[in-house]
Curated annotation (Swiss-Prot):
Protein name (database record): Glycine--tRNA ligase beta subunit
GO molecular function: ATP binding; glycine-tRNA ligase activity
InterPro entries per the UniProt record, alphabetical: Gly-tRNA-synth_bsu, Gly-tRNA-synth_heterodimer
Location in or out of the cell: Cytoplasm
Organism this protein belongs to: Helicobacter pylori (strain Shi470)
Keywords tagged on the record: Aminoacyl-tRNA synthetase, ATP-binding, Cytoplasm, Ligase, Nucleotide-binding, Protein biosynthesis
Subunit description: Tetramer of two alpha and two beta subunits.
Family according to the record: Belongs to the class-II aminoacyl-tRNA synthetase family.
Pfam families to which the protein is assigned, alphabetical: tRNA_synt_2f
Length: 700
């Protein structure tokens, strides 16, 4: 037998769920790296976790290391020997090389060639060694390499970790790993594990991976998080069927309860129906954030199920008295929801107009929330006038309602409910607005101002809401860029990348053309209070988001962005049209020929000043191919196309006259006047192509 199964359990105090979940994804990669570092070829690696333990299971862990050769290259022979022919032995430099390696016999030194130089050389062969001596150092290095964000020290231990470590159990090939002193964390190892807390606190001896799994199973520990998740979902499904409810499975919450349980049980509790007068979002958020409960809905109405006065709690207890567990959770939730009622009713007493926005700083150097609201109002007015035809209401009415929406949009940030649950910003503003008899469009736009919340999240439901959402996003971009709060690398504290992506998605979804040069400049000047900064930096930042906006060959996107087109909607339309054309198999030959011809066209003009005159004269054309290309080109220039697709088809149709032109016409004619005329003509053709895209950028 050359290998065996290796199991390592790190027994700890309860690990914080979110930190564990974040780092768990990186653990297999980090363990692999440690094995590779020592040239250990192993089989499948599995890492399991519960709140109290990390378990590393490695299949086919070798019993012996591989024989390895370590090479050492010294100074060049010509300066390390007493004579260049090497017959006179080593000088002081050469002797020093071997002495550093701990070698005394230099009589028969070796040489090798490195970078075309003959140098002193020594190879050290490392014989195979038992891997059992490597296991603990690997485990300790693994623990030290984990990044949970925060760590702590306990007792007089040398190292810190996210929570105190109580034991490391190593099971491998029947070897003895008991009583190994781990000074770093202040304990001696035991080949033992512990049961579920309610089963006892004593160590249970184990002597093999098989015995380890059997002990945990008998003692109410489900080690595999996938199995714990499956158990929870199965029990929730049974409760849904039994009680005719629909449980909203929040995937993040599910992962969290899996991470805080060793033997989960899903139980159904209830709360007083009187609490259902609260907005659903308050109840659901309170249950999720404070208690990690899942919300339940009535099954009667499939289209729009109503919130049920029940909740799912996932318990880690193994008590048979489930009702006692349920009663305890119901008592806690009652207190939480009573607080929520108090906050909500207090908020309803405060008019939205009276919210003291001037008392809250937006960002240092950018004024208060009132200042932000006033800037957004100017932007919203500009956008309302720009998109008036898409609003289905008179402009005067639209300006009034949009202005009102922006005026009250930030009021809920000062409410007691949002102070308690910040993720309800906008949502609570919607409910408060309706309760205070605001227009429904206004109220809904307050709710939707922060949308989309993520890449695939819903967008604002109307152009009206879109204008309010765009105003918020544009002001945040202008403001933060003006004071240098520009994302760099992985740092994006104000989530401006997500915000920008949302801006683009809204504009494209509703076809609200927005020019990243002209409109940005107009708004910057119209608001008039932003600190001066280079608007091209913001323009470039927004353009960089296009690669995530559409599933497409990035070079096609780049070809359109490399032109003067800065209308967001037009950019996307051109990218999609080019993609359709290039993806069509019947255009394969045509595009290959045009790419070849266009690259020649681009090369001829690569050093040209864009502002240089491109005037040319047909009277100076000497070859029939010049006239043929001009006629084909002129036909396109003077045509009106029904669609971008037909325009692209026409431009790509120039591949034939372009190919003939380059076969028969010498652009760099000896006659300077003719040469200049030809270059000017081709420059005009090249510039015209930029109406659809810079074809030289496309890589298919």
């Amino acid at each position: 037998m050359h290998s065996d199964e290796l199991l390592v359990e790190i027994l700890v105090e309860e690990l914080p769920a979110q930190a564990l979940l974040n780092e768990y994804k990186e653990m297999p990669k980090k363990l692999h790296a440690l094995f590779n570092k020592r040239a250990l070829e192993v089989g499948k690696i599995e890492i399991f976790y519960t709140p109290r333990r990390l378990c590393l299971l490695v299949k086919d862990f070798p019993l012996l290391t591989q024989e390895t050769k370590e090479e050492f290259f010294g100074p060049p022979v010509k300066i390390a020997c007493n004579h260049q022919d090497k017959t006179q032995g080593l000088n002081e430099l050469g002797l020093g090389f071997y002495q550093k390696l701990g070698l005394k016999d230099h009589q028969h030194f070796q040489t090798a060639f490195k970078n075309n130089n003959e140098v002193l050389y020594h190879a050290k062969i490392h014989a195979k060694e038992p891997t059992k001596d490597l296991i603990m150092p690997i485990v300790l290095e693994f623990l030290e390499g984990l990044n949970f964000g925060k760590s702590m020290r306990w007792g007089n231990v040398e190292k810190s970790f996210i929570r105190p470590i109580h034991n490391i159990c190593v099971l491998f090939n029947g070897e003895n790993f008991n009583d190994i002193e781990v000074k770093e964390y202040g304990f001696k190892t035991k080949q033992a594990t512990k049961a579920h807390r309610q089963e006892g606190f004593d160590f249970i001896q184990v002597d093999s991976p098989k015995a380890y799994f059997e002990v945990l199973e008998k003692n109410h520990v489900i080690l595999d998080p996938k199995k714990r998740k499956a158990k929870i979902l199965q029990e929730i499904k049974e409760l849904e069927t039994k009680h005719r409810i629909i449980v909203e499975i929040d995937r993040d919450l599910l992962d969290e309860v899996v991470a805080i349980t060793e033997y989960p049980s899903a139980l159904l509790g209830e709360f007083d129906k009187a609490f259902l007068k609260l907005p659903n979002e308050i109840i659901i958020t309170s249950m999720k954030e404070n208690q990690r409960y899942f919300a339940a809905f009535n099954q009667k109405s499939q289209e729009s199920p109503t919130l049920h006065n029940g909740f799912i709690v996932v318990s880690n207890a193994i008590s048979k008295d489930k009702q006692k567990i349920i009663a305890g959770n119901q008592k806690v939730l009652k207190a939480r929801l009573s607080d929520a009622v108090f906050f909500y009713e207090n908020d309803l007493k405060k008019p939205l107009d009276n919210a003291p926005l001037e008392s809250v700083v937006f960002v240092q150097g950018l004024g208060t929330l009132k200042d932000k609201m006033e800037r957004e109002a100017i932007i919203a007015q500009y956008l309302t006038q720009k998109y008036a035809s898409s609003l289905n209401m008179p402009l005067e009415k639209a300006l009034e309602l949009v202005g009102r929406a922006v005026r009250i949009a930030k009021a809920d940030l000062l409410s007691e409910v949002v102070y308690e649950f910040s993720e309800l910003q906008g949502i609570m503003g919607y409910y408060y607005a309706l309760k205070q008899n605001e227009n429904e469009l206004v109220a809904l736009s307050v709710k939707e101002q922060y949308l989309p919340a993520s890449e695939n999240a819903p967008l604002p439901s109307s152009v009206f809401s879109a204008i309010v959402a765009l105003s918020l996003k544009l002001d945040s971009l202008f403001s933060l860029f003006s004071v240098g709060k520009i994302p760099s690398g992985s740092k994006d504290p104000f989530a401006l990348r997500r915000l920008s992506f949302g801006l683009l998605k809204i504009v494209v979804h509703y076809g609200l053309e927005f020019d990243l040069k002209a409109d940005l400049k107009n708004l910057f000047e119209k608001v008039g209070v932003y600190q001066s900064f280079d608007l091209e930096v913001l323009e470039k930042f927004l353009l960089e988001r296009f690669n995530n906006l559409i599933d497409c060959n990035p070079s096609i996107i780049r070809s359109v962005l490399n032109t003067n087109e800065r209308g967001i909607v037009k950019i996307i339309q051109k990218v999609k049209a080019l993609k359709r054309f290039l993806d069509d198999p019947k255009n394969a030959q045509k595009k290959e020929l045009l790419f070849s011809a266009f690259k020649r066209l681009a090369n001829i003009n690569k050093d040209r000043n864009p502002n240089e005159s491109s005037e040319f004269f047909i009277s100076l054309f000497k070859e029939s191919q010049e006239h043929a290309l001009f006629e084909a080109f002129n036909a396109i220039k003077t045509s009106t196309f029904e669609s971008l697709d037909s325009k692209i088809e026409a431009y790509f149709g120039l591949h034939a006259p372009l190919e003939e032109y380059f076969k028969s016409v010498l652009v760099m004619d000896k006659d300077i006047e003719i040469q200049k005329n030809r270059k000017n003509f081709l420059w005009g053709v090249y510039q015209s192509f930029l109406e659809i895209g810079d074809i030289k950028e496309i890589a298919i």
